[in-house]
Regions:
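A cross-family "folded-core" feature that marks the main globular domain of proteins
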Residues: 1-493
Length: 493
């Protein structure tokens, strides 16, 4: 979807991502090579992003250029900027909110000619069709196609373009939606939290706009849980919610509308309750296969990495639901900001082999169930595995061998012991700190020693497979921070 940006904006976004992700100096020539453009273009882009993002701190020197993160700046604001200043995305948003308007009103809103509008729409449709099954038409102005794709795309768009606390939906205030969702949580005992609550509000308000313009999803009778819908419509307190929707939104919250709002959660392969899922895993052949495949993966990973997965069935339940909510919950695919992909990448930097094996397992699971094993779907399932496995990170860290650290001083043994004791207190328990106890010291002795990290206040020549820290260069606080960071850099990987 980044191709909906202009070529210049696309390149500037990639430039900022490079500078944010890599905390180092870049020469202009290197950036030009990475971005496949001229050095002149890089210089122009740097000038533009500096003026566009005054809160970002750029450092320039003979070493090149780098960006310095501050406490109140984050790459998230970069994506908001490019969404906001993109004509293509702005036109898409305008059409979503104003479906049924005439093409002239779009031209007047964006100060463009009719021919320019038609050219832009052709380009938008060309890009969208590469990934989604819907298109924009201008006679009349409508968004038509696969309703799941339409609803997902725009809900994801709103989640990426607007900040967490923003609510850009003038036609639908938040309160009735929140009341409906709180009613659902109570009626179904569905586990809820802040981020999931916001996600559901965005999905529901997107659905409301589509319903407002007369677009309903086709639901296969065999895949829809009518029994759950019926019990929901008869739950105590539903009449007050219906009245609220009627007075605030002028929408009749009947059975059909409720079904359209929560269509993803009334499908038979989604289970609101964990116990219901586990019971179906005993009687339904498809659910049983899904449970067994995921269970085999969890058990395999647990054995290989010596993990104690206390919430095995709960994890399998979440993974099954995640697999069957593709494009029906946010961040299963991204438009500009691959936030979950970045989260997985950060985790993979620490545990590369573990993440790779989980990804392979998820790909096998999807293929075995005849589901599309796209990289985005695999990533989303991997994210769910990592975040929903109880104490996973703690167990992986505890199971890693401790790094052996040698502390030496040319002052005396007491200084070395003092440094070692300080580091032992403030650093994690993933280190074994010792001081040199022999009378003689040689480079060969250090090479043959079992230590992974050597800290000294005197210079030692580089040693292969040893990390050397010259303590005169850093204060104690920086030394603690540096050593803690090193536990994530395994010497054998």
């Amino acid at each position: 979807m980044r191709d909906l940006l202009s070529k210049k904006s696309h390149r500037q976004l990639e430039l900022l991502e490079l500078l944010f992700e890599n905390k180092r100096w870049f020469h202009i020539s290197e950036l030009a090579e990475l971005l496949h453009c001229t050095e002149r273009s890089v210089k122009d882009d740097l000038s533009h992003v500096r003026s566009s993002f005054p809160d970002l701190i750029f450092h320039s020197s003979t070493n090149g250029i780098r960006i310095i993160n501050t406490d109140d700046s984050d790459i998230e604001m970069v994506y908001h900027h490019f969404f906001k200043h993109s004509t293509h995305f702005s036109i898409l948003e305008f059409i979503f909110f104003n479906e049924g308007c005439d093409a002239d009103s779009i031209c007047k809103e964006f100060y463009i000619s009719s021919s320019s509008l038609y050219r832009i729409i052709r380009h938008i449709n060309k890009i969208i069709k590469k990934q989604y099954c819907f298109e924009i038409s201008l006679n009349p102005v409508r968004i038509t196609g696969n309703e799941i794709d339409i609803r997902y795309f725009f809900a994801q768009y709103f989640s990426e373009k607007y900040y967490f606390l923003e609510w850009p939906f003038e036609d639908f205030s938040q309160e009735p939606l929140s009341q409906l969702l709180e009613f659902v949580y109570k009626a179904t005992s569905f586990p809820m939290n802040l981020s999931t609550h916001r996600m559901l509000k965005l999905l529901l308000v997107t659905n409301l706009y589509r319903i407002k313009f007369g677009h309903f999803m086709e639901v296969e009778k065999n895949s829809f849980n009518n029994q759950l819908l019926e019990s929901f419509m008869q739950a105590e307190g539903i009449d007050e919610i219906v009245a609220s929707f009627d007075s605030e939104y002028h929408i009749s919250l009947n059975k059909e509308v409720i079904g359209q709002l929560f269509v993803s959660y009334f499908q038979k392969m989604f289970f609101i309750d964990e116990e219901v899922f586990l019971n179906h895993a005993k009687t339904d052949s498809y659910v049983k296969k899904s449970y067994q495949l995921l269970g085999d993966l969890v058990d395999q990973v647990s054995r290989e990495y010596n993990l104690q997965v206390d919430n095995r069935d709960n994890l399998i339940w979440h993974l099954h639901n995640t697999a069957h909510l593709h494009r029906q919950e946010l961040s299963t695919e991204f438009i500009l900001f691959d936030q979950k992909g970045n989260t997985i990448k950060n985790f993979q930097n620490i545990f590369p082999r573990f993440v790779s094996e989980v990804k392979e397992g998820m790909e096998h699971y999807l293929e075995a169930l005849d589901m599309d094993p796209s990289s985005m779907k695999v990533n989303h399932l991997t994210y769910t595995f990592i975040t929903h496995s109880k104490h996973l990170v703690l167990n992986l860290l505890q199971n890693q061998s401790k790094l052996k650290v040698l502390v030496m001083s040319n002052f005396d043994q007491y200084h070395a012991k003092s440094v070692a004791e300080t580091l032992s207190y403030y650093c994690s328990n993933n280190f074994e700190l010792e001081v040199w106890g022999e009378l003689e010291l040689s480079l060969d002795a250090l090479k043959e020693s079992p230590y992974d990290i050597i800290i000294s206040n005197f210079i030692i020549p580089p040693i292969e497979n040893k990390r050397l820290i010259y303590s005169n260069n850093v204060n104690t606080v920086a030394l603690i921070s540096l050593l803690n960071a090193m536990m994530f850099i395994r010497l054998d990987e």
